[in-house]
UniProtKB/Swiss-Prot annotation:
One GO cellular component, as annotated: fungal biofilm matrix
Gene: URA3
Keywords, comma-separated and alphabetical: Decarboxylase, Lyase, Pyrimidine biosynthesis
Provenance organism: Candida albicans (strain SC5314 / ATCC MYA-2876)
Pathway assignment: Pyrimidine metabolism; UMP biosynthesis via de novo pathway; UMP from orotate: step 2/2
Listed name of the protein: Orotidine 5'-phosphate decarboxylase
Molecular function in Gene Ontology: orotidine-5'-phosphate decarboxylase activity
Length: 270
């Protein structure tokens, strides 16, 4: 049996990462593989949208540095409260891309203190294996076994003209192999392999839409069925959930159901 056709529960039983285990179990219990990307610039709108979308998602993806009125007390503490209320995990889309010592400091310190609240973050492979080791050290120094952290590598992007493909993507996969427990998977457009070597990588895919094919700014959208059939585990949706004229409650249900049905089809449960 390939990873592609195993259920989330089955994958949770054998996965090397506590973060991935928790996420798979959460997805199965909530019956959702939807990640909501909340890119807004005020704390009020950020928290209001998350409260509306929380029941439908397994993961909330943040770009915390675009919030103009950010503070740990008024932004992060309520975010953590909502994650407990609605039972979702948090993914800070930081895209680290520097030497190990620098990314460690960026991860644990500064204004945002990402390691203290984000279950998952991500990194480019351009600087080599050191980015993984630096972030892992930061996680170890600032968290406990009760709050494990995980890393996604950026193997492929959904934007027009992206340089993240081909040899770059393959080298990024090799970097991911350096740490089976901390690196939980990839931001990618398809399955990235690894099963024959004992890896079970989570694939999270942005650029998923049920209606639009692009946004005029380089984003390309693929359908839910299309991405899940080629290996996606979690669909990442942003403006499709709350853009102009869209009701987050209606769209949250719509994307949750579309993603879950695609998963059931892929695993032979539907």
């Amino acid at each position: 049996m390939t990873v592609n056709t195993k259920t989330y529960s089955e994958r949770a039983e054998t996965h090397a990462s506590p973060v991935a285990q928790r996420l798979f179990r959460l997805m199965e219990s909530k019956k959702t593989n939807l990640c909501a990307s909340i890119d807004v610039d005020t704390t009020k709108e950020f928290l209001e949208l998350i409260d509306k979308l929380g029941p439908y998602v397994c993961l909330i993806k943040t770009h915390i540095d675009i919030i103009n009125d950010f503070s740990y007390e008024s932004t992060i503490e309520p975010l953590l409260g909502l994650s407990r209320k609605h039972q979702f995990m948090i993914f800070e889309d930081r895209k680290f891309a520097d030497i190990g010592n620098t990314v460690k400091k960026q991860y644990i310190g500064g204004v945002y203190k990402i390691s203290s609240w984000a279950d998952i973050t991500n990194a480019h492979g351009v600087t080599g294996n050191g980015v993984v080791e630096g972030l892992k050290q930061g996680a170890k120094e600032t968290t406990t076994n009760q709050e494990p952290r995980g890393l996604l590598m950026l193997a492929e992007l959904s934007s027009v003209g992206s340089l993240a493909y081909g040899e770059y993507s393959q080298k990024t996969v090799e970097i991911a192999k350096s740490d089976k427990e901390f690196v939980v998977g990839f931001i990618a457009q398809r399955d990235m392999g690894g099963q024959e070597e004992g890896f079970d990588w989570l694939i999270m895919t942005p650029g998923v839409g049920l209606d639009d094919k692009g946004d005029g700014l380089g984003q390309q959208y693929r359908t839910v069925d299309e991405v899940v059939s080629t290996g996606t585990d979690i669909i990442i949706v942003g403006r499709g959930l709350f853009g102009k004229g869209r009701d987050p409650d209606i769209e949250g249900k719509r994307y949750r159901d579309a993603g879950w049905n695609a998963y059931l089809k892929k695993t032979g449960q539907l």
